[in-house]
Amino acid sequence: MVFLIIALTLLATGARAASILAVLPTPAYSHHVVYRAYVHALVKNCHNVTVIKPQLLDYAVQDECGRVEQIDADMSAQQYKKLVASSGVFRKRGVVADETTVTADNYMGLIEMFKDQFDNANVRRFLSTNRTFDAVVVEAFADYALVFGHLFRPAPVIQIAPGYGLAENFERRRAVARHPLHYPTFGAAALTRRGGALSEWRLLNEFELLARRSDELLKQQFGKSTPTIRQLRDNVQLLLLNLHPVYDNNRPVPPSVQYLGGGLHLAQALPQRLDAPLERRLNESVDGAVYVSFGSGIDTNSIHAEFLQMLLDTFANLNNYTVLWKVDDAVAASVALPRNVLAQKWFSQTAVLRHKNVVAFVTQAGLQSSDEALQARVPMVCLPMMGDQFHHARKLQQFGVARALDTAAVSAPQLQLAIREVIADGEAYRARIDKLRAVVEHDAAPDEKAVKFTERVIKFNNDVNWPARSLKTTAANMAYSDYFVRFPL
């Protein structure tokens, strides 16, 4: 009976079961909730997916016509946090990364982490099996992992990002990139846009240097004949981005770049429930509750004492509200918590945000967190700390659904004022949230769109001599010197 159902499903969709390799090495929870949803959507459509990933989230599925095989690359999220903290990426107040920290030296630790993961015995054993795949999916932040497109050629390569793409992702597709005002590199947006073109030029040079150093490691690890990062990028046929283009300033892109609309991790998510004591406390918070979380990628143990005290002073002055604070146990135990604060190392975030008495969300402006807040109609106060969070916080403020503050300089009175403002104007904020949700409402579910374009790449991959098969532009992965200088006279 099961085989009959599978056969009928494939017949109805007109698809064939594909064998897909997904290489997803970054041990970041906010990344993997998106990647897992994508993998589950592929499996639901009867494809078989082998995932190389760290021990973080379980990708196993049951009762689907496809299957998931997990290859443990064994790199814990805690190791990742320590590596990032020790790399010098975070400078201000212990948790805020400004543009000056985006250097090849600081990012080499991440590249070496990828190298160590791919040297893992489980991964080496997998590579020795000489299996074949119909497609290789690689996370867009990990160009080093593009080597799997070479190892399993001629399978086409697809990149996926949990949110915004990097400038390198766009320029290799020959989409618009590196405009200091309209389409800045995420690092250049970290402060106040000072420096403009000079910042973009510096970041371009830093990432070119990082690519050259990655080339050296790739040849050490996989042999002298291993292609360079630039050459490996040429194998990428499709870039999937888990956000709506309105957040990316409606960037002009070719068909090889697909915005999924955002909320991919929410597409098939089951409703979460609060535990009874927490639900009771929120029910009793008649004036409202404020939820404070800086996401899974920030090690709250690294918060400097001055910033920590600023937060505590803010919470104490919000004494008519319950404050739910996601923070490591060691931090909570080291301070005197105000009586209105409940500190825990983990909350069921979607369930908390959906409670009727939660009136504001203090967030680092991570894309997944903001998607959840918008779904729950909760206004935000953004304290961005790294990467694309600075740009995203500004966009949320521009759309009128959040207040964005300078995390490196904000004081307790300023933070308290912002929180009280979004609470006092809650109805206006929720009305604008409803308008924004209507704008970004999906024409197609993000998981369905991701599967559709993945299947398209696989379907036409064998027609290598047919120009119409590709979603890429004719200028894809062309060096700027060739793109702007070489043309027929």
From Swiss-Prot:
CDD domains: GT1_Gtf-like. Residues 1-17 form the signal peptide. The keyword Glycosyltransferase applies. It holds the Pfam family UDPGT. Keywords: Glycosyltransferase, Signal, Transferase. It comes from the Viruses. GO terms for molecular function: UDP-glycosyltransferase activity. PANTHER family: EG:EG0003.4 PROTEIN-RELATED (PTHR48043), FI06409P-RELATED (PTHR48043:SF145). Catalyzes the transfer of glucose from UDP-glucose to ecdysteroids which are insect molting hormones. Expression of egt interferes with normal insect development and block molting. Belongs to the UDP-glycosyltransferase family. This is Ecdysteroid UDP-glucosyltransferase.
